[in-house]
Every structure is written in structure tokens, then in C-alpha cells.
């Protein structure tokens, strides 16, 4: 039977190829189904528990339906529209994030749910203390209160992490001040800001403790770790208890033993304890603070000698720092000037400087201190003639201390004190060299005769400096010299031979005194510098210019040049070149002295740079004879005689006639005004007011007699008469002013706008139109320009 079936199957396979293809397709489908089942079984172990199991059943049913379906062509289904990813509201975002899908209204029903919802929203907007803890610490100083330094708080107190508006404003201001160069992206990064703050804190710690720094300079400049005590210093430097108390290695006994040798000062500032206040002042010393700081205080010992026994009297050691004092406006000649600046704080009160009474003054001698700023070397020189010094305090200042009184009681006997007839006087002098004092006197006063010189001279071969005295100067000695004065400056390097005597402001009775010589050279008399303005004019044709007077400020020089020959083949001759002087060219050079300030200003304001030496080409007019233009302008007296005797503004009859004509112009019609313009030869304008204004201004330059005569004459004759009268009036006023006359005679172009303003504001008092001025200049051959 099996054999029969095998034969039947083989017959089927060989029966038709179509049947064989269908069979292979079914076999492939069955294999795919088996593979799909195996894959599903493998993926079941990854299936979620809550997932509905209907999905697998649906897949199996779909596979069965696909088997039964015919292989017919079906239309593709349309894709479903995608849901728009819209921005969710804040409440929905909070519900999904913190409320686990529950609506906010459902949570409101129970108190616990409502509290959880609020805390969840607060936690979303709250900051994290582990990230901005450093910023909160800095906000404490702004708010002046402390925050809790606990770690992550409990849920009940979660709302305390929220920041108020003031807190956030302070944080933003703090960040912008500390980090002004942050970009918009890094400004919101709290981690970046926290790292920056930590770096700055570390740098501040390094600067406060330079030994922590690895640089050699920071380690070398750092103070020692351990400070020496008084016992350590006493053992290290073999000091006594007295030296430890006084903080100095100089003792009074050392000064008494050796008068000539100056002891040295040992400073222990690097190893001394710095806990003591620097502002405290020892009672035994009177310290005056200086406005300009010095490297270290200078110890100075004051010495004086008795006139009889010449016994040295050591006063005491003082730390002296000069301070500018307040002077009275009225001085008696026993004080000195101080050129130092005022300091802010006063180290010693005025009570520490008691004024010496007149009966207790004693004569003390001294030399002037000479200190070099570079190496503090002091040179001892022979005492020269004492110099006069003015003071501003009514009484000298005595430096009082316990050591001074103690020194006086030990070394000075009562008999020596009684031998003095006058009291001692102590004056602190300014450290100025004796050879360079007051070499340039500028003023002398009567009180300068009885002026004491500086009683101290500083001398020492090494630092510190001490004062030593060499000689005794009595109080009644005259120390006023010819070369010194109360008011003076630094030493001048000019020779005395070139100085000029200065008359004294006060009259002295002493006939031996001479005039004070000034070290400044004699002032030379001021010589006014002459300024000349030169210009050149190039004129076609021959022009003859008469020689002017040598005393005149205007000099005209004619330079004759020949015209270059014209090539008749290549160039066409101009009609203007034909004439008598067709082969000549005149160049006029005008030199005028400029002595007025207005002339210089006008030359600088000239926009065409006519103040420079330039060449201006002026073509000759064929209607006017240019052979002697300059002479006709300068020597024309006929025009002056025609109107020189008339006074327009001062004649009452003329003023009345003008007033009548002014009224007549206002009453005239436009037609009559145009006829008057034509009669006078004026250029017609538009507007009745403008016509009345021009006629009124022009009428000021025309006499009434000429107006009456012109009415009987024909049109051309009347125009010529009025025009001549107007031009003569303008020429009369121009010849009265030297500035305009020089310009016209030197062929310099005049500005019509400036001439118009000058005629309106000057003696003429007439504001003419530029057209009339242009015709006037053209008529008389005056060069002009209309540039404003």
C-alpha cells in the first residue's frame, strides 16, 4: 500500500509543474509559521505580568485569517494621524510627575493627598543645598541672619528651601558682581559658579598665608613662625634689662663716656614682637608725625655749651619727625617757614610744646643740618655768614621731656645758669644747605634786621644722625646780609653782574644798606614785530603804476614780463589779445604792512587762502584805460570837491527833505516805483516793500538839488547824474577808512558782503544792494569777490 502511495505521489510531481510550485509554496508557509511559534515562545519569558494576554491570541487569529484569505490585491490603508506633541500645562506636568497619575481634584478630597501634592510642587521649584550651599552662606551676610546648616531636610520642612524674591535678587547681584564675564549659558550653572568661588577662596587663603605658596619670594617675605620673647632676645644679643625695657641699645652712660663718638643704633624690627601697638607714644619721647613717611626714626642728641665754661651739656635723645605747624598771619621775625604738607593725624598735642617765657630764654648755638636724600651723608663745613630766616610763630617752641630736665640737673650748676643774661631759644630749622640758602631775594621787610639764624647743624658720619655744636652765636649779633632776605627761592645760577637792582618797598634809616640785587636777568624791551602781506596780480596788457611814498605802508612794484610768442599754426589767437599791448603782460606785486589785529584775523579767515603769496589773473577791460588806474583813484580830487562839503546827516534841511521823500515812497503806487527805478538806473526787483527799501537807502546818497535837476533832464542824463552822485558818496566813505583804501590801492579783491555790512554799520549808514556795489567796482576798476 505504501508503495502504491509513493508511486501516486511521484505521479503527481511529474504530472504538472504548476502543482509542484503550489506545493513548494505551502511548504514555505508552514515553515514560517513554525518559526514564528518558536520565537513567540522564546519572548514569553520577557512578558510583563500586567499586560493583557489577549494580544497573543489576536496574533494567532490574524495568522489563521491570513491563511484563509485569497491572494487578492488589496488597497493600502491610510495611516492614522499622529498625535501632536503639545506643551502640557503646569498642573498636568505636576500631576504626571509627582501625583502618580492621580488628578489634583482627587487629591484635594483627602488632607494627606493635598499636602503631598503641594510638597511635590514645592520640591520641584526648590533649590538643592548640596549644590548652592556656598552661595547661601554668602547670602547670610546680606540678610544678617543664619540659616540652618542641616543636610537634606525632612518632607515637612521642605518648603523652607524655597527662596524669596529678595534672596534670588541678592544671589543674582552677587553672581554678576563676582563674575561679570560669564556667558548666558554658564550664568545658570550653579556647579560652575561654585567651582569658581572655591578657586577664589583658595587664592585668598594663599595670599593670607604666603608660606603655603610654593614661590621663593612668598616664603622669604613671610614672618618667622615663632616669635622671640624678651628673655630670648636678652640671651641672644647679650642685652641688659634696661635695654629690653627701653627697646634700644643706646644708654645714657654711653653718651656721657664719649662725647665725640656717635653710638650706633641697632634695630630688631624683624625679630621683635609685633603685638605692641605702634600708635602708642612713650612718655619720655615727644614724637611729631610727618606727612611724608621716612624709612626709620632718627635719633638726635641735642648739645649746647656754656658761654663761660664752654662745658658740653647733653640734653637727651629725641625721636624727631618734623610736622607742619599752623602759623599765625602776624609774625615777629623769630620763626621759620615750613614747606611741608599737612598730615591728617596729629601725633602729639600742643600741650607737649610749652612756650618759653621771655625771662627764661637762653642762647643756644648750632649748625644747619645738611642731609642728602640718597645716602644720608652729612658734610661738616665751616660756619658761614648766618642767613636771615622768617618765622610765623609769636614765640619759639621748646622741646620738653623728662630726660631734658634730668640732664640739666645733672650737668649744669646753678652758678652757670645765673651767668646767662638772656634765655635760651630752641628753633627747629628746615634741612636746607647753608650755601644754597636764599640766593634770590624778592622782598625785604623792616623786621628782617633782628632775625635769628637756625641754631642747629646736623653732623654724623653714619646713620643714625646726631646734632653737634661747634661755636657759640650771641643773640644780639646782627645777621642780616646783602644777599639774603626773608622771602627767597632756591639758589640761582645767574651771575651777579647781569642782575638789576630792585628798589626796596620799605625805607630804612641805615645808610649803609644798599639796594637788593635780583638774580634774574634784565628784561629786554619788547619790539613789535612787523607783519607784511604780499600779493601778486597778473594783468593782461601794459599797466603803468606810479611809485608810492616810502613812508606809506603800501608798496607797489611793477614787474614787466613778455608774453610768450603764440604759435599761429597750432593756436588760435584770442580777440582780446589784439591791441597795443598784445605782446606784454603786467605783474604787480603789492606789499602791505599788517599792524591791526582785525587784519590778521581777516587774513586767517580768508577761505581762498589769499593771505599767502599768490598770483591772481585779472583781465583788462576794453572800455577802460588801464594805463594809470592807480593814479586816477588815488589823486582824484574832483569827486571829493563835489560832495566833500556836504553833510548829509548833520544838515537839518536835508533830513527834512529825506523824511518827505520817505513818505512819498510809501504813498507811491507800484507803477510809480518802477518808473523811479528806471529813472535812477536801478535794477528792478519784485515786491513793493523791497522797492521802497532800496529807494529809501539810495536816496540817502543823493542830494535834493541833484534830484530836482535830474527831473528836467532826459532819462539817460538823469541816470548818469544820480549814478555819479552815488558812486562819489561811496568813494568818499571808503577813502576815510585806511583799511579799505589800502586794499583798493593794492589791487586786493574786496569782499562785497563785508563792504555792504561796513557801509550799513559805519558812518554812511546805508545798506546798498550788491548789484549797486558790483557796478561801482566795475566802473572804477576795483577787484572784488562775492564769496560770503
Curated annotation (Swiss-Prot):
Residue spans of biased composition, Polar residues class: 612-622
Signal sequence, start to end: none
Localisation per UniProt entry: Nucleus
Annotated protein name in UniProt: Structure-specific endonuclease subunit SLX4
Region of interest called Disordered, as start-end residue ranges on this chain: 59-86, 562-584, 599-622
Subunit structure: Forms a heterodimer with SLX1.
Free-text description of this protein's post-translational modifications in UniProt: Phosphorylated in response to DNA damage.
